Amino acid sequence: MRAIIETVFDIFYLATVLTVGIRMIHGSKSGSQFKLFGLMAVVLGAGDSFHLVPRALALCTTGLENYAVPLGLGKWITSITMTVFYVLLYYVWRKRYQVEGQKNLTIAVYALSAVRVLLCMMPQNQWLTNKTSLTWGILRNVPFALLGLLIIVLFYRSAKDHSDKAFRWMWLTIVLSFGFYIPVVLWADVNPL
């Protein structure tokens, strides 16, 4: 029963996020923040599909333990697309608040992202096995968490400084996103569901 419910939910989620993202891209002006949000949705959905589709197949067939390689590859790809997602969110911030310059800030965003991707590429992560490394799970997420913290601070300060009611809680949505993500990193192998 769990396999069916989770699979139906995943199909609904992927179809929704990809459809909304594509519609936002096609319905927005070139270079607009809404086009960036659409691109973010497509990156998120496409990245998530690399681990949700193999997970659904595993749950509906022979089990997760028999799908170590496709599940690991999917988590690996998702880790990188999540990084791209936050780089795009940085550009939403720049566009929304008409930020010019800030070269050092942009360098920091790209440096943290590059370190994250580099750490994700290391074989010590053991992505393609049933037992990934908790230590490397933590290490590769340190630059990701710092990138997230940077984006949180940028949106918090800018929304406050510009009295931006529409984005006043954006920082909190990012905090919640990381709040839900951290337990997955720390305890996914303890209780893989």
Can you describe what each PLM-predicted range is?
Residues 1-7, 19-45:
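Membrane-proximal first intracellular loop
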Residues 21-27, 50-67, 72-107, 118-124, ...:
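Internal transmembrane alpha-helix with an interfacial aromatic "cap," most often the third helix
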Residues 1-18, 137-141:
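Hydrophobic transmembrane alpha-helical segments in integral membrane proteins
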Residues 6, 105-109, 130-148, 170, ...:
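A loop-to-helix transmembrane entry motif
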Residues 111-137:
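Membrane-helix boundary elements
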Residues 28-43, 100-109, 162-173:
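Membrane-interfacial loop-to-transmembrane alpha-helix junctions, especially the N-terminal start
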Residues 44-47, 115, 143-153, 165-186:
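Hydrophobic alpha-helical membrane segments
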Residues 130, 182-193:
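Extracellular/periplasmic helix-loop-helix junctions in multi-pass membrane proteins
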